[in-house]
Amino acid sequence: MEKIKVREIFNNAYSVDFGDGLKRIATKSLVPGKRVYGEKLVYSDNIEYRVWNPNKSKLGAAIINGLKKMPIKKGTKVLYLGASAGTTPSHVADIAETSLVYALEFAPRIMREFIDSCNERKNLIPVLGDANRPQDYSNIVEKVDVIFEDVAQPNQAEILVKNAKWFLKENGYAMISIKARSVDVTKNPREIFAEQKKILIEGGFEIVDEVNIEPFEKDHMMMVGIWKGN
């Protein structure tokens, strides 16, 4: 068994040191022995950790790249927009641990993959729906502490504001992975990031952190905001 050093960097999120100088992060396994996307399982003091691959998770990439504000923690209720097959939502569920994570995905085929890989995480609630239409899933999703968005649409920022108005508690947090090329392939990414930030601020957010997630994802920026409403 590999000898590793584990250190908590955020609540329920850890750095793992294999002694090779590489930066790695992990979460405690909510379902020990269960992999979601082929991730490595490691052990320290009889606790199992899932190594979090930043090449497959924009939130993981942001943490590796120096994210300072991490609002997701134990007991945090989360709405995750753009769940895909469940890679990042599974780590978010590990962190939230005792509270619910609503995971929204638009594509039925991908949602089936998500359910197959994450069905043992009892705090992870699959929701099939369109992030542009929060009213359609308002009978399922309760008020949440954090919204995380990873939706590759031209109106990414507007989608976040729309969902915040429906579901985010006052002074709750939102995290959004902005994909510049999904907004406009003709513009400089920095210009797009500035435009998206302006939409978020005008929509009711105070931006408190920004992290570029290259080289893990090209032309992506993670932004963290506090919801002040409007």
From Swiss-Prot:
InterPro entries: Fibrillarin, Fibrillarin_CS, SAM-dependent_MTases_sf. S-adenosyl-L-methionine binds at T87, T88, E105, F106, D130, A131, D150, V151, A152, Q153. One of its GO terms (biological process) is tRNA processing. GO terms for molecular function: histone H2AQ104 methyltransferase activity; RNA binding; rRNA methyltransferase activity. PROSITE patterns: FIBRILLARIN. It comes from the Archaea. Its EC number is 2.1.1.-. Involved in pre-rRNA and tRNA processing. Utilizes the methyl donor S-adenosyl-L-methionine to catalyze the site-specific 2'-hydroxyl methylation of ribose moieties in rRNA and tRNA. Site specificity is provided by a guide RNA that base pairs with the substrate. Methylation occurs at a characteristic distance from the sequence involved in base pairing with the guide RNA. NCBIfam families: PRK04266.1-2, PRK04266.1-3, PRK04266.1-5. Interacts with nop5. Component of box C/D small ribonucleoprotein (sRNP) particles that contain rpl7ae, FlpA and nop5, plus a guide RNA. This is Fibrillarin-like rRNA/tRNA 2'-O-methyltransferase. It comes from Methanococcus maripaludis (strain C6 / ATCC BAA-1332).
